[in-house]
């Protein structure tokens, strides 16, 4: 159930991101989207340290983009659209209602899972802690690790290109 709510929030953030016009609000939406993605990754991998590292890397990239945007954009006023806020709230509530109506056994499964988790929490905690670090380099998640390495390399190249001393947007003004 938690995974479903987080995925719905990711979907709604994607819709909201397409409606944003101000670069700083786009950066904020991208940061929230990254946080939700890290939550989903942490829940699936059962080890949040990988999600924490991923979030810190994206945060570093976002800080570089923030410096770039603030040096280029003028002092535009940032206003929140009431219509966009209501649209996202209605979309989220409507999607949750549709999920509950279409899947009548979802609530029953949720209650059964909560009861089962109470009993198996201690046994699984010991076994999962041993295997959770091994999962990072095995098949399903090794692709995420390779993607992270490529992202870091691309971010390094972009950072070097942006921060050239006399040619980039961060050059000193005369």
Swiss-Prot record:
The keyword Protease does not apply. It catalyses: a ubiquinone + NADH + 5 H(+)(in) = a ubiquinol + NAD(+) + 4 H(+)(out). One of its GO terms (molecular function) is NADH dehydrogenase (ubiquinone) activity. InterPro entries: ComplexI_Subunit6. This is NADH-ubiquinone oxidoreductase chain 6. It is an enzyme of class 7 (translocase). It is found in: Mitochondrion membrane. It comes from Anopheles gambiae (African malaria mosquito). The chain crosses the membrane at residues 25-45, 48-68, 82-102, 143-163. Its EC number is 7.1.1.2. Belongs to the complex I subunit 6 family. It is a multi-pass membrane protein. The keyword GTP-binding does not apply. Keywords: Electron transport, Membrane, Mitochondrion, NAD, Respiratory chain, Translocase, Transmembrane, Transmembrane helix, Transport, Ubiquinone. One of its GO terms (cellular component) is mitochondrion. The gene is mt:ND6. Its main location: mitochondrion.
């Amino acid at each position: 159930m938690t995974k479903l709510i987080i995925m719905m929030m990711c979907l709604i953030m994607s819709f909201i991101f397409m409606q944003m016009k101000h670069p700083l609000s786009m950066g904020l939406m991208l940061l929230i989207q990254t946080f939700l993605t890290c939550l989903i990754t942490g829940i699936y991998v059962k080890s949040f340290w990988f999600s924490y590292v991923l979030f810190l890397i994206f945060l570093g990239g976002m800080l570089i983009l923030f410096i770039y945007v603030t040096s280029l954009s003028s002092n535009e006023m940032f206003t929140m659209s009431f219509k966009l806020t209501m649209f996202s709230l209605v979309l989220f509530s409507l999607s949750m209602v549709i999920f509950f109506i279409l899947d009548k056994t979802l609530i029953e499964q949720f209650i059964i899972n909560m009861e089962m988790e109470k009993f198996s929490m201690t046994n699984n905690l010991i076994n999962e802690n041993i295997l959770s670090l091994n999962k990072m380099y095995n098949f399903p998640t090794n692709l995420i690790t390779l993607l992270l390495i490529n992202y870091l390399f691309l971010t390094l190249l972009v950072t070097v290109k942006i921060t050239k001393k006399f040619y980039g947007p961060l050059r000193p003004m005369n």
